[in-house]
């Protein structure tokens, strides 16, 4: 079983540039002795709202009025977690009216309630795409691991399902993956060759691209998983409201926003 840490926009892959054509030379040299001036409290506050741009500011300020201890370690260490199964969530909302379940400022993650007719789930938004990676179970090829254990073993903050796994007659062990995955540069399994299967890959520049599952893996891909279907590519909806066997069931999907944020959606 492969697992990934962390209305999406996933870009189709452009042509791969020559690694030797680096743009680093265009950057101005940095003086290692130059110190960075600490942000004032007001600047820290504005930086927080800029990072978590989706927050409804008035609802967050009302939450702080009720819970002033939230700021005891500063704006960049705000930690709110009411995302547990038995929790009701916070009284914080996004500008679109969605309930906020958790905010982890240090790790730049926000959890948002997603719900509709007959379903609900959680959307995790990771602001720093460089934190995302794919990991394998300790018993890859033989047995899988509970997600919680896999995340803890690899120093992660949160995780979700990646590839599917071989499960003949419901008796699989979770250790043999279906399709192909790449985890931190190492490939596992074999590509799906059936039509409709896609591969989503993360490249060295922390961009996600969706391509056909049987296409060649580019040299700059660091992590990848394969499954079906692709829901959104370049802002275009690729499937209808009911896709073959999917319907309303527990599902997981991953994508990337126009701001390069990692979107990890789990429907319960």
Spans of model-derived segments:
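Active-site-adjacent helix-turn-beta-strand microarchitecture at beta-sheet edges
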Residues: 166-243
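Domain-core and long-helix interface of multi-subunit machines
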Residues: 233-268
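Short acidic-glycine loop/turn motifs at beta-strand connectors
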Residues: 126-130, 201-207, 234, 256-260
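Zymogen propeptides
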Residues: 1-190
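A short catalytic or substrate-binding loop motif that flags glycine-/basic-rich loops and adjacent residues
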Residues: 115-118, 191-194, 244-248
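Short glycine-rich loop/turn motifs
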Residues: 118-123, 197, 248-253
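Solvent-exposed loop/turn segments at secondary-structure junctions
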Residues: 130-131, 164-168, 216-217, 250, ...
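Structural recognition of the beta-strand scaffold that forms the well-ordered cores
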Residues: 157-161, 201, 209, 253-255, ...
